[in-house]
Regions:
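Glycine-rich phosphate-binding loops of nucleotide-dependent enzymes
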Residues: 2-271
């Protein structure tokens, strides 16, 4: 299968260069409730970072704060060293952050190809067509359905379309919220295989919130654990997979997330 290649930014060495995305001591409120409590993290170029946590931990709120859907009360968010917090979402998209929210949001009455072109609304160049072909290369079923209204696609196909539309912005960072939600195990493996290929072949930097901790950690390079709006643990994916706490609470026998099904009896106190 021939897949065209998007123009890649130069590689950066972790620890020697500024991260693409920096979140510094962010606090975000839902009404009077503090949903994000002093969160700080980094995403380096060409890496996949995953965020793990139970329901209500603040993962989705964090992505919404980064993408401008919600405004932080405190802290900074930097993209390539420039502050973006508090900006309108369309401005943040133009700066290079694409957000694929949970729930497979597509424009149901537009065709597949029209949905992809909507993803390129911030662009005014002649390479939109070649980028659509790139998306079709990774998601061949979308090429077959390109003239079909998106509302008639299956759940897995809609998820592929949502990811493809996010790619059409040529993002510096692609935010993915629960891409496996509601999908069969076979489709989950297929989509995460494509996510890894997009990272390796196209150099797409990603921040991934995912309920399936096993597949997320085996796809990502680095991970953070959130609890009640705070970052309580961080490390390479290999380190997190080896953690007894992660194994006990998140990784079941079949690799399914155990969040919310039992109480987290930690062997140690988070630092």
């Amino acid at each position: 299968m021939n897949v065209s290649v998007m123009e890649k930014p130069g590689k950066q060495a972790e620890g020697k260069a500024r991260p693409v995305l920096e979140v510094k001591n962010i606090e975000t409120f839902y009404g009077a409730v503090m949903a994000i409590r002093g969160v700080s993290l980094e995403v380096h170029e060409g890496k996949i970072v995953t965020i793990l946590g139970a329901n209500g931990a603040g993962k989705t709120t964090l992505l919404k704060t980064i993408s401008g859907v919600m405004d932080p009360e405190k802290g900074k968010i930097l993209l390539d060293g420039k502050e973006i917090q508090g900006r309108d979402p369309d401005v943040i998209v133009r700066r290079g952050v694409a957000h694929v929210p949970e729930g497979r949001e597509v424009f149901p009455f537009l065709t597949v190809e029209e949905n992809l072109r909507m993803g390129a609304f911030t662009r005014n160049d002649k390479e939109v067509g070649s980028d659509i072909e790139m998306v079709y290369g990774y998601f061949p079923i979308l090429r077959e359905r390109r003239r079909q209204q998106a509302g008639y696609l299956s759940g897995g196909q809609q998820q592929m379309l949502a990811i493809g539309r996010g790619l059409m912005t040529r993002p510096r960072v692609l935010l993915l919220d629960e891409p496996s939600l509601g999908l069969s195990p076979i489709l989950v493996q297929e989509i995460f295989g494509i996510i890894r290929r997009l990272n390796e072949e196209q150099g797409v930097t990603m921040m991934l919130v995912e309920q399936n901790a096993n597949v997320a950690l085996r796809t990502a390079d680095y991970g953070y654990v959130m609890e009640i709006g705070r970052i309580v643990m961080g490390g390479s994916s290999q380190e997190l997979l080896a953690s007894e706490d992660i194994q006990e609470f998140y990784l079941g026998v079949q690799g399914e997330s155990q969040r919310g099904q039992k109480r987290w009896k930690r062997r140690k106190t988070w630092r």
